[in-house]
């Protein structure tokens, strides 16, 4: 069973485990990092290149996460939330119609954007009836409610890339 929205999904940022960050106080300041004071015979200046490289790596990682997060920012969050609620409702209703859990459900594809592209309510209803042809329970109420819920929704188009 799948519910297709037509939009891309934001990739979750994963942190590279084991990366260490060293903090360095300004030269002439008091107190070094715990890391530099734990090495015998090393000074703050000795650990400065390590701190700079580690900090640069962290900044790069944050920039990567920020770039990945831009995908959801370009979509209207309110529309995404409405779409997610609708998809969860569809999965719940299909579970009731087919009388089984999501994992056991036959492969039913309801493409919300495809429904929104349809020219009329009749065409949308027809597409839904085709998708639910294997359902043994009455689907009219589900179709009516789904059409009511998508009324006024906008199609999620892929985000436009900004030209640099």
Curated annotation (Swiss-Prot):
The modified positions for Omega-N-methylarginine read 27
Belongs to which family?
Answer: Belongs to the PP1 inhibitor family.
> Which GO molecular function annotation, any one, does this entry have?
protein serine/threonine phosphatase inhibitor activity
Give the modified residues of type Phosphothreonine: 72
Q: Provide this UniProt record's keywords sorted from A to Z.
A: Acetylation, Membrane, Methylation, Phosphoprotein, Protein phosphatase inhibitor
This chain belongs to the protein called Protein phosphatase 1 regulatory subunit 14C
| Record field: compositional bias (Gly residues) | 1-19
Feature: compositional bias, Low complexity: 50-62
**Record-linked Pfam families:** PP1_inhibitor
List of residues that carry Phosphoserine: 25, 33
Q: Where is this region: Disordered?
A: 1-72
UniProt subcellular location: Endomembrane system
Q: How is it modified after translation?
A: Has over 600-fold higher inhibitory activity when phosphorylated, creating a molecular switch for regulating the phosphorylation status of PPP1CA substrates and smooth muscle contraction. The main inhibitory site appears to be Thr-72.
Q: Which residues carry this modification: N-acetylserine?
A: 2
| Membrane topology summary | Peripheral membrane protein
* InterPro entries on file: CPI-17, CPI-17_sf
The entry's cellular-component GO terms read: cytoplasm; endomembrane system; membrane
Job description of the protein: Inhibitor of the PP1 regulatory subunit PPP1CA.
The answer on whether this UniProt entry bears the keyword Membrane reads: yes
């Amino acid at each position: 069973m799948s519910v297709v929205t037509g939009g891309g999904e934001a990739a979750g940022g994963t942190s590279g485990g084991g990366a260490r960050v060293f903090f360095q106080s300004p030269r002439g300041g008091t107190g070094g990092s715990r890391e530099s004071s734990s090495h015998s015979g090393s000074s703050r200046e000795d650990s400065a290149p390590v701190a700079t490289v580690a900090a640069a790596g962290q900044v790069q990682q944050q920039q990567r996460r920020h770039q990945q997060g831009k995908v959801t920012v370009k979509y209207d969050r309110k529309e995404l939330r409405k779409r997610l609620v609708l998809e969860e409702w569809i999965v719940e209703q299909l579970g009731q119609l087919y009388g089984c859990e999501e994992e056991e459900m036959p492969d039913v594809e309801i493409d919300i954007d495809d429904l929104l592209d349809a020219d009329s309510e009749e065409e949308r209803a027809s597409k839904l009836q085709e998708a639910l042809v294997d359902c043994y329970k009455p689907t009219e109420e589900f179709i009516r409610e789904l059409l009511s819920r998508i009324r006024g929704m906008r199609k999620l188009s892929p985000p436009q890339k900004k030209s640099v």
